[in-house]
């Protein structure tokens, strides 16, 4: 390890970029960043992996959990309920295979990503994997005739939006597959369009279609979404990534479908078009969190403006204390190559520096050749980026923005984070039932990991959505005496932290506890040396 900074005492946790962290200005902070300064062992940013053919076997999933996966995402635009039920079973089998060692056990969350009001093409020549080449300048007929649903080729393309002929005009653009293929409408019929291929390429089955500027009148929650969400409730998923959310009422509709049985499922709204960005505040208010879905967003709004939307949304989520996920094309080239491009490395790091709580992999883990390498790469980049955050300014601003409150949990959380900076603590240990105490601490972005001890498995899994929370599940029976039960859980967290290298004997940790059993009573902060 490099030598700790003189002001830092002896806690080894604080060597990462400490010289820079002590800078007085942001520019000085940047000047002091040092590529030879090792980051800490803990990674604070969550990693969400899409599970698909390349990663759904129990063996691969075990390796992905070891490499750092926190949330498994299932994309319901593809696959049947049977297929997804099997994937969920595999994720849980892989997760529970580590259960014999409570110290190394990681609760992995399951996320259901809805198809949402999106438009997709049909199957190419009856196969999910076939592709055809579309040549620039060629004529492509778009049809609504179901006879072609599974018989698309380079001359005719079926898609599943029945009103397309009403909402596009001659001269309109149609984008397919994240905008890789663009078509221009030349002629309109009652149930077909004739288009010219402006930008060609190879087209696969069931690709997404975007109609920028068109007033697409699809319902927020389709019939398929209702079935999928009910399936998710039965399968006990932890969160829903709701696609193409355009306004707050869309979120309420998803909430209504989840119903009483699914009331604890977190709803993360995916912002993927202009209306969603424009009405961001009302959507944030209604949601449990936000996903910056840059794929569709980059077609619906100009590509050069996506970073503005990303920074604005991450900023507002950080201000509101709600989790935000950065997604799409983060390590895209790793689908086919073992190393990312330099631009992708920067992109992952900058998403973390912007303040994202989680970063996501899509095709990289679902269908790529290097799923494990992609997870490891995100893990390494995130850790380095977290060390380079200018906490001095960040904490100051978050604290200033927080409303004055008489809520003991809020006040204790701010105090704990402030104290953790002052004494360079190795971790902040929080005992939490509903997860709220841990979320409050995470909101102030401490440098040290937050070890959240809970007996509620769902609280543990959902905690991965928040930056910095390292959830651990306590399976020991509740002790009769409250004080003994507190000690039991704090010691459990100490053992986890030592085993994982977050801190060692002699370091200090901050411990947050309640004064009586139940939720909502966290009000005590202690500074404790590690035994």
From Swiss-Prot:
Functional pathway: Carbohydrate degradation; glycolysis; pyruvate from D-glyceraldehyde 3-phosphate: step 5/5
Which residue positions does N-acetylserine occur at?
Answer: 2
**Annotated positions for site Transition state stabilizer:** 270
Q: How is it modified after translation?
A: ISGylated.
Which positions carry Phosphothreonine?
41, 195
Query: Its Gene Ontology molecular function terms?
Result: ATP binding; cadherin binding; histone H3T11 kinase activity; magnesium ion binding; MHC class II protein complex binding; mRNA binding; potassium ion binding; protein homodimerization activity
Q: Where do the annotations place K(+) binding? A: 75, 77, 113-114
In this chain, the stretch annotated as Intersubunit contact covers: 389-433
The chain residues annotated with the modification N6-succinyllysine are 66, 166, 322, 498
| Annotated binding of Mg(2+), by residue | 272, 296
Modified positions (4-hydroxyproline) are: 403, 408
- Residues bearing Phosphotyrosine are 105, 148, 175
**Which residues participate in ATP binding?**
75-78, 120, 207
Sorted alphabetically, which InterPro entries does this protein's record hold? Pyr_Knase, Pyrv/PenolPyrv_kinase-like_dom, Pyrv_kinase-like_dom_sf, Pyrv_Knase-like_insert_dom_sf, Pyrv_Knase_AS, Pyrv_Knase_brl, Pyrv_Knase_C, Pyrv_Knase_C_sf
Q: Which Enzyme Commission number(s) are listed?
A: 2.7.1.40, 2.7.11.1, 2.7.10.2
pH dependence as annotated: Optimum pH for T3 binding is 6.0-6.5. Increase in pH causes T3 binding to drop, does not bind T3 above pH 9.0 or below pH 5.0.
Q: How does it assemble?
A: (Microbial infection) Binding to certain oncoproteins such as HPV-16 E7 oncoprotein promotes homodimerization.
Q: So what does this one do?
A: Catalyzes the final rate-limiting step of glycolysis by mediating the transfer of a phosphoryl group from phosphoenolpyruvate (PEP) to ADP, generating ATP. The ratio between the highly active tetrameric form and nearly inactive dimeric form determines whether glucose carbons are channeled to biosynthetic processes or used for glycolytic ATP production. The transition between the 2 forms contributes to the control of glycolysis and is important for tumor cell proliferation and survival.
Q: What is this protein called?
A: Pyruvate kinase PKM
Q: Which gene encodes it?
A: PKM
């Amino acid at each position: 390890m490099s030598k700790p900074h003189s002001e830092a005492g002896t806690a080894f946790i604080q060597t990462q970029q400490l010289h820079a962290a002590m800078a007085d200005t942001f520019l000085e902070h940047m000047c002091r960043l040092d590529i030879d300064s090792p980051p800490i062992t803990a990674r604070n940013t969550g990693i969400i992996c899409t599970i698909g053919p390349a990663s759904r076997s129990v063996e691969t999933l075990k390796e992905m959990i070891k490499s750092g996966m926190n949330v498994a995402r299932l994309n319901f635009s593809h696959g049947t309920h049977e297929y997804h039920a099997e994937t969920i079973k595999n994720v849980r089998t892989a997760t529970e295979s580590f259960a014999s060692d409570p110290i190394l056990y990681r609760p992995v969350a399951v996320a259901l990503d809805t198809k949402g009001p999106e438009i997709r093409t049909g199957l190419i020549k009856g196969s999910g994997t076939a592709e055809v080449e579309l040549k620039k300048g060629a004529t492509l007929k778009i049809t609504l005739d179901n006879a072609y649903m599974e018989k698309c080729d380079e001359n005719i393309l079926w898609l599943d939006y029945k009103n397309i002929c009403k909402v596009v005009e001659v001269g309109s653009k149609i984008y397919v597959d994240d905008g890789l293929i663009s078509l221009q409408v030349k002629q309109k019929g009652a149930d077909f369009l004739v288009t010219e291929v402006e930008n060609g390429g190879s087209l696969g089955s069931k690709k997404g279609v975007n109609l920028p500027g068109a007033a697409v009148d699809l319902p927020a929650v389709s019939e398929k979404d209702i079935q999928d969400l009910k399936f998710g409730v039965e399968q006990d998923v932890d969160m829903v990534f709701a696609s193409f959310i355009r306004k707050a009422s869309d979120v309420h509709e998803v909430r209504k479908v989840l119903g009483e049985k699914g009331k604890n499922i977190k709803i993360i709204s995916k912002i993927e078009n202009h209306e969603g960005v424009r009405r961001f505040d009302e959507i944030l208010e209604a949601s449990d969190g936000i996903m910056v879905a840059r794929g569709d967003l980059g077609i619906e709004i100009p590509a050069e403006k996506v970073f503005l939307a990303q920074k604005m949304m991450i900023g507002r989520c950080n201000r509101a204390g709600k989790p935000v996920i950065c997604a799409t094309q983060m390590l895209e080239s790793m689908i086919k190559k073992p190393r990312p491009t330099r631009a992708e490395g920067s992109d992952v790091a900058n998403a973390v520096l912007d303040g994202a709580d989680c970063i996501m992999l899509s095709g990289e883990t679902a269908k790529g050749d290097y799923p494990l390498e992609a997870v490891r790469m995100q893990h390494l980049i995130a850790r380095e980026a977290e060390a380079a955050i200018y906490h001095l300014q960040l904490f100051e601003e978050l604290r200033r923005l927080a409303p004055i409150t008489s809520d003991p949990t809020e006040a204790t959380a701010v105090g704990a984070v402030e104290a953790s900076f002052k004494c360079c603590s190795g971790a902040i240990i929080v005992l939490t039932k509903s997860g709220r105490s841990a979320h409050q601490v995470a909101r102030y972005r401490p440098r040290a990991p937050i070890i959240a001890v809970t007996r509620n498995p769902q609280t543990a899994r959902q905690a991965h959505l928040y930056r910095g929370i390292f959830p651990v599940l306590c399976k020991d029976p509740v002790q009769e005496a409250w004080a003994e039960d507190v000690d039991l859980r704090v010691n459990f967290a100490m053992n986890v932290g030592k085993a994982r290298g977050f801190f060692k004997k002699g370091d200090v940790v901050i411990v947050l506890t309640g004064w009586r059993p139940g939720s909502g009573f966290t009000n005590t902060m202690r500074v404790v040396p590690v035994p």
